[in-house]
């Protein structure tokens, strides 16, 4: 996974050369070198609200539209949700996964007009599979730093244009031999978790069965398997031991967009805003001596920073819903531990006992998650947007009753890039 263009936590709030229509000089442009990482107190930042959310209906192939048409569809829906027009947007931040997924290099060169960015700042973010989350955080930091007041952020993937399996089967010296796709890379880490935690081999099937049932309640989800059963999941072919076919994410075409704005913009919004209480990014190398692929340190650090910003001391009790990046079903229990919802070796017990069900104590992926919808570049932003929908009370049939705080989570590369935000139904205090 290429880290080129990855936006560091210290750099996300400082868009080089991006001049706001309100003017970059003075206090609106004074982001400070540490503004993006949440190192400053909330009192020094502008509160950020999500006031518009739009998605395409995700499918295996959108042959009816170009990439430009796909992204404009999501952007238009986000603007309509916010009841804003293109002229209300000060800047555009877009993201997608590696270009070989479509075979179109630097597609952002062709998207300024489709996204209403002509004459305005537009930038692209790239942090592999976590890019959808990172892109939203860069946009959020532009508002928090008072560089821009209202920002359109969007992430997308049109995987039908190329072959993701081929693209992810990298040759030596970039990857070990005999790997096929992302599953070939992650399967040994799943096996290591099972051995370390003493988890029964049925847990992955439970996650897949749950998420596919949740997806039936989400009209935007790619996979709508009305005949899904636990037995069907368990009988599906083994692709990368211990990962079965039905425990694997699909390849999707789709886009997701959000409109982020400041306190004044939120006050004018016809929709209930989702307020950003904390957001962070962390990274680490793909390979290094002592790396823990089962529970990467970067993921732990990223979650800890978000919780600190949001004043969360007990995530298991204080967070009402989690949209977690789970491309292979076993990553639900693994990330439950990595994010502090369960002690080491205990995550699978939450899954097995039904805690993560839609009606459980800690619903995980009520939307159906990445296991049901996976336009890779947009998958992380969908997690963030779905978390925002939960606290707005607008998630439809997959709404978690009484959700007040929700976590959006994304990871990418060789479990090396992490991005997360926590949103709430009320403005942050302080």
Predicted regions mapped to residue ranges:
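Long, intrinsically disordered low-complexity tandem-repeat segments
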Residues: 2-39
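Condensing-enzyme catalytic core mediating Claisen C-C bond formation in acyl metabolism
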Residues: 35-68, 205-207, 238-305, 353-367, ...
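Conserved active-site "lid/cap" helical segment
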Residues: 38-130, 138, 193-200, 222-223, ...
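Conserved catalytic cysteine-centered active-site region
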Residues: 42-46, 59, 96-154, 158-185, ...
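Beta-strand segments within the central parallel beta-sheet cores of soluble alpha/beta enzyme folds
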Residues: 86-96, 121-127, 151-155, 202-209, ...
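Active-site-proximal alpha-helical scaffold in enzymes
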Residues: 126-157, 183-217, 258-264, 374-395
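Acyl-CoA/ACP chain-elongation machinery
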Residues: 155-156, 161-163, 167, 208, ...
């Amino acid at each position: 996974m290429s880290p080129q263009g990855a936006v560091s936590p210290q750099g996300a709030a400082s868009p080089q050369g991006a001049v706001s229509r309100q003017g970059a000089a003075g206090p609106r442009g004074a982001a400070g070198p540490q503004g993006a990482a949440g190192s400053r107190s909330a009192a020094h930042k502008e509160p950020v609200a999500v006031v518009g959310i739009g998605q395409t209906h995700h499918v295996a192939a959108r042959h009816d539209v170009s990439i430009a048409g796909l992204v404009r569809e999501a952007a238009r829906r986000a603007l309509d949700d916010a009841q804003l027009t293109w002229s209300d947007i000060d800047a555009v931040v877009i993201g997608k996964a590696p270009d070989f997924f479509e075979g179109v290099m630097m597609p952002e060169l062709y998207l300024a007009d489709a996204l209403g960015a002509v004459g305005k700042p537009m930038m692209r973010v790239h942090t592999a599979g976590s890019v959808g989350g990172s892109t939203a955080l860069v946009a959020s930091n532009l508002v928090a730093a008072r560089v821009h007041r209202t920002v359109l952020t969007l992430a997308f993937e049109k995987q039908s244009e190329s072959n993701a399996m081929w693209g992810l089967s990298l040759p030596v010296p970039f990857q070990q031999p005999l790997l096929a796709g992302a599953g070939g890379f992650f399967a040994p880490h799943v096996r290591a978790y099972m051995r370390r935690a003493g988890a029964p081999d049925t847990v992955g099937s439970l996650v897949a069965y749950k998420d596919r049932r949740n997806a039936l309640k989400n009209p935007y989800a790619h996979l709508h398997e009305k005949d899904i059963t636990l037995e069907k999941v368990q009988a599906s072919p083994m692709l990368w031991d211990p990962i079965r076919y039905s425990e694997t994410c699909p390849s999707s075409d789709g886009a997701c967009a959000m409109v982020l704005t400041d306190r004044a913009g939120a006050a004018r919004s016809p929709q209930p805003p989702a307020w950003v209480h904390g957001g962070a990014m962390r990274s680490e190398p793909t390979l290094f001596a002592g790396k823990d692929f089962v529970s990467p340190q970067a993921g732990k650090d990223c979650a800890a920073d978000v919780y600190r910003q949001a004043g969360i001391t007990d995530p298991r009790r204080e967070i009402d819903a989690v949209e977690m990046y789970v491309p292979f079903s076993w990553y639900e229990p693994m990330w439950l531990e990595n994010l502090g919802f369960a002690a080491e070796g205990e995550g699978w017990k939450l899954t097995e006992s039904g805690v993560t069900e839609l009606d459980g104590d800690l619903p995980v992926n009520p939307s159906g998650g990445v296991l049901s919808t996976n336009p890779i570049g947009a998958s992380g932003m969908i997690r963030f947007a779905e978390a925002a929908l939960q606290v707005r009370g607008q998630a439809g049939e997959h709404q978690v009753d009484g959700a007040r705080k929700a976590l959006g989570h994304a990871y990418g590369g060789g479990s090396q890039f992490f991005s997360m935000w926590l949103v709430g139904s009320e403005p942050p205090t302080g």
